[in-house]
């Protein structure tokens, strides 16, 4: 998994700070895949060193619906600062949409925030993939915070038409 960072000098695992709760279902997936990957890489009973900060998704969703991305950034920046103070070596946001405020979060912390679009671009490049379909919430599909990162790395991004965007958003 792209966010598993191991330094192989005897194997020292880094502590991952997870900003989750958007939704708790997606957070479970991150936690599960992270631990399955650690077990696969290290074997035995190894599990990931991680710290989870779960935000109240109701508050985040209201901010999204009202276009109050500044308040969302404040909430997630507070979460990121808490994770940093708790000892996280880097941070992952356990959802695509909230990467819209990743730049603002980064301004409030002194540890790396791994941007999912950057990590996705790296994996696509490794696989030789140059064209992808982007599905997600309407914010992820219609705004540039994800798409531009891929396009700036030479990856053509295909997005559904407006009716399809609404359908996909409703399903999510």
What positions do the PLM features span?
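Non-catalytic structural scaffold of enzyme domains
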Residues: 9-172
């Amino acid at each position: 998994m792209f966010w598993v960072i191991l330094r192989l000098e005897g194997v020292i695992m880094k502590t991952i700070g997870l900003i989750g709760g958007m939704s708790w279902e997606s957070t479970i997936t991150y936690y599960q895949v992270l631990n399955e990957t650690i077990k696969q890489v290290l074997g035995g009973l190894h599990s990931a060193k991680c710290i989870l900060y779960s935000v109240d998704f109701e508050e985040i969703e209201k901010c999204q619906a009202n276009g109050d991305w500044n308040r969302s950034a404040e909430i997630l920046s507070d979460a990121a600062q808490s994770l940093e103070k708790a000892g996280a070596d880097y941070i992952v946001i356990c959802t695509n949409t909230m990467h819209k405020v990743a730049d603002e979060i980064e301004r409030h912390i002194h540890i790396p925030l791994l941007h999912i679009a950057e990590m996705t671009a790296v994996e696509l490049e490794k696989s030789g993939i140059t064209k992808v379909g982007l599905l997600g919430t309407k914010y992820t599909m219609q705004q540039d915070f994800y798409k531009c990162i891929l396009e700036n790395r030479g990856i053509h991004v295909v997005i559904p038409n407006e009716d399809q965007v609404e359908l996909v958003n409703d399903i999510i």
